[in-house]
Amino acid sequence: MALYKAQKAAIIEQFRQHENDTGSTEVQVALLTERINILTEHLREHKHDYHSRRGLMKLVGQRRRLLRYLKRTDAQRYQALIQRLGLRG
């Protein structure tokens, strides 16, 4: 259920803006999206795991806030990120 170090490094490598970038909005959203996908798969199998469901809702809320911030500050980066992650329909 956790995101392994190698997976995390690969996601950071793919979405970073510059060489030392680990905390840009794009990287944070990509990491949250991966964690959300993992938890979603877990909940498909364990339908009554309500504690994990609450954690999933918190992650989705955090991702929503970050995406709202990115849309407000730089709409082009927002659109590019949505396309790359396959979010929003």
From Swiss-Prot:
Record Pfam families: Ribosomal_S15
Gene Ontology MF, one: rRNA binding
InterPro entries: Ribosomal_uS15, Ribosomal_uS15_bac-type, uS15_NS1_RNA-bd_sf
Annotated PROSITE patterns: RIBOSOMAL_S15 (PS00362)
CDD domains linked to this entry: Ribosomal_S15p_S13e
UniProt keyword annotations, A-Z: Ribonucleoprotein, Ribosomal protein, RNA-binding, rRNA-binding
One biological process term in Gene Ontology: translation
Presence of the UniProt keyword Transferase in the record: no
One GO CC annotation: cytosolic small ribosomal subunit
Signal peptide start-end: none
HAMAP family named in the record: Ribosomal_uS15_B
Function per UniProt: One of the primary rRNA binding proteins, it binds directly to 16S rRNA where it helps nucleate assembly of the platform of the 30S subunit by binding and bridging several RNA helices of the 16S rRNA. Forms an intersubunit bridge (bridge B4) with the 23S rRNA of the 50S subunit in the ribosome.
Assembly and oligomerization: Part of the 30S ribosomal subunit. Forms a bridge to the 50S subunit in the 70S ribosome, contacting the 23S rRNA.
Family in the record: Belongs to the universal ribosomal protein uS15 family.
UniProt protein name: Small ribosomal subunit protein uS15
Provenance organism: Thermomicrobium roseum (strain ATCC 27502 / DSM 5159 / P-2)
Phylogenetic classification of the source organism: Bacteria, Pseudomonadati, Thermomicrobiota, Thermomicrobia, Thermomicrobiales
